[in-house]
Amino acid sequence: LATGVSTLAKLLNPKIKVIGVEPAGANCMQESFKNGKVTTLPSVNTIADGTAVKTPGSNIFPYIKKNLDDIITVEDDELIVAFLDMVENHKMIVENSGLLTVAALKHLGVKDKRVVSILSGGNMDVITMSSVVQQGLIFRDRIFTVSVLLPDKPGELAKVAQTLADVQGNVIKLEHN
């Protein structure tokens, strides 16, 4: 995607700035860009499975080297937050690799500038989606896991429930043993 977009963008406007984005746990293109040659990573670790590659394509690397002005990385946590934002605020499902550009925006200092952020792909299974939403809610302090040791007598759990209700809290799941 970066090869085609950057090549076309530079053909249309040679002065345009094109920045590539990779997951921090799979930054083979960034390393290759820095080294000036195709570089293989020892391993990759990212939730962005569509971009989780150890070695960039040798055929596309010359175009990337020529047409990208920079390559930055984003952490998986930033992808999780971007996914939650897209679902809640824009009602869009975009796979983790397709959200790299959205997650990168906060690193670029582009306020009051014209920016195009390309979103691609919606290939995400529901189990992964559920996990990403859950993690996003945790990162935003919207859900918590709490363990409480209560005396074994009537009314104790009701007191905890009332305390939560007093602060507009809700119980999603309760385990008792």
Regions found by a protein language model. Name each.
Residues 9, 13-17, 22-79, 91:
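Small/polar-residue-rich loop-to-helix segments that shape phosphate-bearing ligand pockets
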Residues 57-113, 172:
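Active-site-adjacent helical/loop segments in soluble small-molecule enzymes
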Residues 7-11, 31, 106-107, 162:
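Short, well-ordered alpha-helices that flank and scaffold nucleotide-derived cofactor binding pockets
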Residues 129-177:
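A conserved regulatory-domain signal marking ACT and ACT-like small-molecule sensing domains
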Residues 15-17, 114, 170:
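Residues at the starts of beta-strands that form the adenosine-phosphate
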Residues 41, 61, 110-112, 118, ...:
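Active-site loop ensemble at the mouth of alpha/beta enzyme cores that anchors a bound cofactor
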Residues 1-6, 26-30, 97-105, 118, ...:
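Short glycine/serine/threonine-rich phosphate/pyrophosphate-binding segments
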